[in-house]
């Protein structure tokens, strides 16, 4: 959140669409009144609303008669459960039949001008061949396949090939360590892992196959490894009998493989997210409801049309890439960007050169990137961006000053800005403006999407707070199609995390306010999760990595405000007797986090001190947050602490840590 006062009254009307321009399609939604009418129907009669939308946007092998059953309260909701559908047919085949030469994937390689376009006809052939290769490796209906790949077209081809077989993909972000890869592979008992010899990002070459080789020493379920050669010359260490080069096996298979037909509640993919216990949770998204949520939000939030070119600069290792690089755009038959590089390579104009080169119509990035480019200066925003209609922000609340720069400088005051709020577990947007019609308030996610019965709950009583101009915890009262159904092999964990805190509601974990106009403002996490550059990490996960070092007796991790990344990790460390805080020890502790989770999780500061504990032994992170924020006068009641005097020691330790050079 911004440290400056927020103007809750500033309203920016959505830009007027250029009428009479044949290159600009008619908006998918006409007015704010139409949104209000559709929203009311989606809440009051969800079966009719979502049933009509599913029939309109999806091709069914067997029509459903029941739209939704079950409830949030019982964690048993299901959508279109008596129907049957082929997800890959919906994503690829039907567009390859209707518009075979339309562009499906826009590959922007790390080095500018080295990418390529892939049509829907070509995508169907490549996906079919990859599916055939995986089938020859023993992959079939319901099997799990891991993907640890760079942002290249073959990654999306692999995802779709797995889906084509009715198997379940588990994409692992290519910045995770070998230990993190092994944890995810073992939890889901993957049969095959797909990787590349290396990735290219920001002019650097990063080995991937070596990480996989190390991980697989602990992964007994993996039988085959499919390896794409991203380097000019093969560099990977291959294991005979287990590892297969992509270029050796893929061409051997036919360019058409029949797509699997599945029940709409069949798992489409697993995606691991941070858990409060430190063990990542395999969030399960199911086919019918998830695909509908992805398609509907793309259609109405981004005003995406089949002739559009969607630009999302995310990574498929996270939910943003799943929903708004792969599944949403392809469901609508649009072209979608596969961006391998960084916003600063070779310079800070890279994003805007991509927009100009490919004539992108939507642009979707995180506030971290927006802040980075805002700092770099307006001189880099020099490319033709006239093709853009809707800008989007994702991952964390966007500060009003960054919103205004995005709107005024990047969008030239003619593009709507959608500040989208959602989570891995929600599958698609839950609070957001609809690009063509919603008046914008810088800093606010605005209004609930269709079917999202959003409520503000009093955290003390657990009761709904009615009316506007209220603050509390954000929760959802009714099922929606794209919601995760469970945690892989851990339904009790799903219930404990999302449903038990406030029975009868889905708990988002975020605090929120609803202003006098009914607009929702996200205030940040109320549970033990940090948000770094839009990526959520459990504090327990980082603490466990620190505790793996022999010197650490206890640790407590908190997130602190950071102008660039949103939050940064600060770690409080209590050392075992006989150990001293040295520069060398600090390096070892940071390396422990890097090697266990990944470099992006590294603590910004290590603070060596005792910890504020209650008499029952619970660490009071609230006190640590207040001290780090310089709000010592707002710490409040210390009577529950076992030793209130420890607070003074922590204040001195924080002061000392701040004096040290970073």
UniProtKB/Swiss-Prot annotation:
Catalysed reactions, as listed in the record: acetate + ATP + CoA = acetyl-CoA + AMP + diphosphate
PANTHER family found in the cross-reference section: ACETYL-COENZYME A SYNTHETASE, ACETYL-COENZYME A SYNTHETASE 1
UniProt: ATP binding residues: 395-397, 419-424, 510, 525, 536
Enzyme class: ligase
Sites where the protein binds CoA: 201-204, 320, 533, 594
Coiled-coil spans in chain: none
Protein's name according to its UniProt entry: Probable acetyl-coenzyme A synthetase
The entry's keywords: ATP-binding, Ligase, Nucleotide-binding, Phosphoprotein
Modified residues (Phosphothreonine): 596
Domain of life: Eukaryota
Keyword ATP-binding among UniProt keywords: yes
Any one GO CC term of the record: cytosol
